[in-house]
Amino acid sequence: MRINMLSSAESVKGQGVASAFREQVTLIEEMKDDFEVEINSKSSKFDIFHIHTVDPKYRFRMNKKHLNIMYVHFVPSKNDGSLKLPRLFNWIFNKYVEKTYRKADEIIVVNPCFISELEKIKIKRENITYIPNFVDHDNFKPLHKEIIEELKKKYNVPIDKFIVLGCGQIQTRKGFDDFVEVAKNNPDMTFIWAGGFSFGRITDGYKKYKKLLENLPQNMIHLPIIERKYMNEIFNICDVLFMPSFIELFPMTILEACNVHKPFLVRDLDLYKPILFERYCRGNSVEEFSNELIKLKNDITYYNQCAENSKFISNFYNKDILKKTWKDYYLRVYNKWFTNNNSKNIK
């Protein structure tokens, strides 16, 4: 079966969507006996077009000759707090996204919470499948203590401090303001934010956050956008991942932290419950976040329990299990839409 993977995610650095794209493509490429994969091929001679981003050039390539699969990494209702766009333009963009999703034959969601949102925009439930993100254990894994000490020197991170890591684009929805406030309230800990402005000046809150970065508390370090191949080092030098986002999808950063067996603290959002099984630290305010971090720092039993929860999540989203999931999915939907004479069934 020939699959054309279409995506522009890797053209913008520092996006979780790009990480998810690379993990999924690499996984399918390993199944050489079943699938022949190309990326952004201009040819139309494929059985499946698997579209990862909503670019117009990919939408226009959807047709009746092949199966069109749309990978949904966000829904319009969750598209607030990332980019600062005029209200009319934002409305037009959301309508465009809805029509693009409806044009696809099949939809894949990375979070089951999206399913009801997609049904609201008249996408049939029978054409929606939930397949979670995953992170390869070969790329993100615990390192030896001696290596971690050397890495802390490399990144100028104190060896004897409790290290709190935040990751992602600096924008309103990521809760960056709360991250900074929690850092101010805990001067005995060191806070690191790895990430920057992937979309430049159109990032929501760009001017405010540029100014904030110039006046960070003394116990906070900002690392600009880091290539993903070095992010395993960053996760290993930290003690806990802290993600105070107001809106999320299925964060690759959480899966990466889990692979390194680090506890993680998040805002108490409903969308985490079905995918993380409530095996995580949570809070809803600067005070609650601070209390959780203090407990993780001072209570070794609690810390180890939370680290075990991360191991559980890491093992659950297993590459080998998901390899079978993807193989079964492609075969199932292709057989669903095509008859024996290769004529596409219009449903």
Segments from the language model and where they lie:
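Membrane-proximal helix-turn-helix segments that form the acceptor-binding/catalytic region
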Residues: 88-107, 210-213
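Conserved donor-binding/catalytic core segment of Leloir-type glycosyltransferases
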Residues: 158-174, 180-184, 192
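Glycosyltransferase donor-sugar binding loop
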Residues: 190-208
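Nucleotide-activated donor-binding/catalytic signature segment of Leloir-type glycosyltransferases, i.e.
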Residues: 205-229
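Short alpha-helical donor nucleotide-sugar binding micro-motif in glycosyltransferases
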Residues: 225, 233-238
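Aromatic "clamp/platform" in nucleotide-sugar-dependent glycosyltransferases that forms part
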Residues: 246
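Short hydrophobic beta-strand element within catalytic cores of glycosyltransferases
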Residues: 259-266
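Conserved acidic donor-binding segment of nucleotide-sugar-dependent glycosyltransferases
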Residues: 277-288, 294-300
